[in-house]
């Protein structure tokens, strides 16, 4: 950690096709082993599949899916005395987006469709309709925070 000044957030370049920073971030989350062009192909193919199935604006569906997966609270471990408590904390907006994208991609990777593009499209469509594994993950995190509400005074 630097001692002199706080390091600012890096500016992310928008994606070349839709000029969206959100999509560029999503491409970076999907990317494995530095293969960005492969990640871009997967995302753009998934968006094409969504456009075929729904006919609506595919970026709106992506935004709706992320909205339904974004957590508002999470639990963090806090050691007090000899025991560890799961303390519910509010999630900052940047982390909220990052978690939503990560959970969507994880859920898509566990699906059964043939290609990653189809899996991702299916998971995004499910999430936009408030169902699917990623939404279930968010519900589990919220349930955990609700169950541990008694330890909220240990927040830092």
Curated annotation (Swiss-Prot):
Highest taxon in the source lineage: Bacteria
Any one annotated GO CC term: cytosolic small ribosomal subunit
Annotated organism of origin: Shewanella oneidensis (strain ATCC 700550 / JCM 31522 / CIP 106686 / LMG 19005 / NCIMB 14063 / MR-1)
The protein's name in its UniProt record: Small ribosomal subunit protein uS7
Gene Ontology biological process terms in this record: ribosomal small subunit assembly; translation
UniProt-listed PROSITE patterns: RIBOSOMAL_S7
Function: One of the primary rRNA binding proteins, it binds directly to 16S rRNA where it nucleates assembly of the head domain of the 30S subunit. Is located at the subunit interface close to the decoding center, probably blocks exit of the E-site tRNA.
Oligomeric and partner information: Part of the 30S ribosomal subunit. Contacts proteins S9 and S11.
NCBIfam families: rpsG_bact
MF terms (GO), sorted A to Z: mRNA binding; rRNA binding; structural constituent of ribosome; tRNA binding
Family: Belongs to the universal ribosomal protein uS7 family.
A Pfam family of this chain: Ribosomal_S7
HAMAP family tied to this protein: Ribosomal_uS7_B
Keywords: Ribonucleoprotein, Ribosomal protein, RNA-binding, rRNA-binding, tRNA-binding
Gene3D superfamilies listed in its UniProt record: Ribosomal protein S7 domain
